[in-house]
């Protein structure tokens, strides 16, 4: 039976760093309006205006007012950015109202992106955000890659906080690892090829290929945390105490398929000469 303090181990809205950044970014850029239209299979009115404002927000976030938060984990924020750009490019033709020219809107957006990414390519400053464009046709599989990337960001953030041990933070961390481990276990069981798919190999510490290392079994004691690398699913109570170990070698078939939707946020930084070019690109939308 759960103890009275089990509720302390439930993840709050501010406990997951990647989620916090994503929600703030989506609100600032109004990305949710675009995403909602996609999810509801509706048209987005005035797509040209929406893209114009979206570009302006990107300029402000990443080129005019970049934060240390973006620069400190710019590799991750760059992957986020590429994810969302590929998402938007994919769905512009699908959700643009028939009264607007979706091909023209998409082309102008692509030209805008060329200007921004070119600025990063030629900027040698180590104090500014940089990002390389990775052009890919958007597929639902990319959502899962993003889910894995977000998990690893949250995992790293938890481990940094746990350098000074706190049992409640530990059991929140354990809950998050267990939840994501179960989720990706189901994914791999449904699509076994994903386990060795290079798209799910973000780095040596964040990869489905090394499942047990990416998703360790976490036990939270009074004064320390124990992590064991294992492909086994760790069934724990909310305080992280091991109650059952269920062996599963990730090679089974026919488990329930569970693909999630979850978009995020992204990162950019500035070069004054290119900033002018990008702003000029914005005005093309108003011609």
Q: Across the structure, where does each feature detected by a protein language model lie?
A:
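C-terminal single-pass transmembrane alpha-helix
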Residues: 249-287
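N-terminal targeting/regulatory segments, especially signal peptides of secretory
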Residues: 1-252
